[in-house]
Swiss-Prot record:
It comes from the Bacteria. Transmembrane segments: none annotated. GO terms for cellular component: cytosolic large ribosomal subunit. It comes from Geobacter sulfurreducens (strain ATCC 51573 / DSM 12127 / PCA). This is Large ribosomal subunit protein uL16. Part of the 50S ribosomal subunit. Keywords: Ribonucleoprotein, Ribosomal protein, RNA-binding, rRNA-binding, tRNA-binding.
C-alpha cells in the first residue's frame, strides 16, 4: 500500500473538492494515459488494485507510471464506540482527485492493449475516467 513515510499533522480536515485539477492534467511520461473526469477520493488499496489489473493484462510489455499518491489521512472510530471523545485515529490514506488529473500513464504497448488495460483499471476506481493519448494533443 502507498502511504507517506511521515507527515507534519497526523489528522486532516475533510476539505472540499472544487474546480478542475490545476497540476498533473497532461501526459508527462508515457504515450497513453487514464484521466479523471469526476472528483473523488481514491484509496491506496484502489490505486494498487488498478495497478495490478493493468500489469497482469500487459504482462511483460510496456511501462506504467502511477501519477497519484495517497497523502490525505482518513480517520475512523472503533466499532461500538459512543460519539464524542475526540476525532478517531488514522485508518487509511486517500488521494484527492479532481477532474482532469492524469491517474496512470503507459508506454511501450499498442493503443488497443493500452485501452483495454486502462478499461480494466477504471473498473477498480471510484471516479469516472477517460483514455487519452499524445497523438490527440494531450502532452505537457
Amino acid at each position: 500500500m502507498l502511504m507517506p513515510k511521515r507527515v507534519k499533522h497526523r489528522k486532516q480536515m475533510k476539505g472540499r473538492m472544487k474546480g478542475d485539477a490545476q497540476r498533473g492534467a497532461s501526459l508527462a511520461f508515457g504515450e497513453f494515459g487514464l484521466q479523471a473526469t469526476e472528483c473523488g477520493w481514491v484509496d491506496s488499496r484502489q490505486i494498487e488494485a488498478a495497478r495490478i489489473a493493468m500489469t497482469r493484462y500487459i504482462k511483460r510489455g510496456g511501462k506504467i507510471w502511477i501519477r497519484l499518491f495517497p497523502d490525505k489521512p482518513l480517520t475512523s472510530k472503533p466499532a461500538e464506540t459512543r460519539m464524542g471523545k475526540g476525532k478517531g485515529s488514522p485508518d487509511s490514506w486517500v488521494c484527492v482527485v479532481k477532474p482532469g488529473k492524469v491517474l496512470y500513464e503507459m508506454e511501450g504497448v499498442t493503443e488497443e492493449i493500452a485501452r483495454e488495460a486502462f478499461r480494466l483499471a477504471a473498473h477498480k476506481l471510484p471516479v469516472g475516467t477517460k483514455f487519452i493519448s499524445r497523438k490527440d494533443g494531450h502532452e505537457s
